[in-house]
Regions:
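Active-site-flanking segments in enzyme catalytic domains
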Residues: 1-186
Length: 186
């Protein structure tokens, strides 16, 4: 169980609760909980446009991928069959489908064991990236290399933007907020 915000104030910290008498694997439970939280938080932030492809987000791109997987030329026939059966197992729930892919992403793909198809991997990697240490380890694998190079390029552009912002703040003798420095480190 989780709570992404308290009431109408969106700046409150989230809460996640787990049963005291946990019978399942705690890692799997927390991974599932985090996946559900990411999905719902994205929906909360996007508001009514959570599945509108004109505003790229985790939920919009993932819903688009699931809705139009039959027309996607990047997927093989076998991958399309797997998506169809996975959707039946998830009872046609985009959220449940994402959570299952997220668990696979964290548990297997993070250990260089590819299980997801290319399209799902790119979407999840874009919005749910691994830490720097795991990304560096995955960079050796050719399956992840191109995707991670694009991610690194995108992040270097953001870092450049943050550097420019820090320079402007230094020139005006304003203290740089800790959040900006933390974003730069990530």
């Amino acid at each position: 169980m989780w709570q992404e915000i308290e009431g109408k104030r969106r700046t409150t910290p989230s809460r996640m609760m787990v049963s005291i008498f946990q019978m399942e694997d705690l890692t799997a439970t927390m991974t599932r909980l985090t996946g559900e939280f990411r999905w719902e938080m994205c929906r909360r932030v996007q508001g009514p446009r959570w599945n509108d492809v004109s505003e790229p987000s985790l939920t919009s791109e993932y819903c688009d991928y699931i809705q139009f997987y039959k027309k996607n030329h990047e997927l093989t026939a076998d991958a399309k069959d797997k998506i169809k059966s996975a959707m039946q197992k998830a009872k046609n729930s985009y959220k449940e489908m994402f959570v299952r892919d997220y668990i696979t992403w964290i548990m297997y793909e993070g250990n260089s064991s590819p299980r997801l198809n290319k399209v799902a991997r790119v979407i999840i990697a874009t919005y749910c990236p691994f830490s720097k240490a795991i990304r560096d380890r995955l960079m050796v694998n050719p399956m992840y290399k191109e995707m991670l190079e694009k991610y690194n390029l995108k992040m270097s552009q953001k870092v450049h933007h943050i550097d420019n912002l820090c320079q402007k703040l230094n020139n005006t003798k304003i203290e740089i907020p800790e959040e900006i420095l933390n974003q730069k480190k990530f």
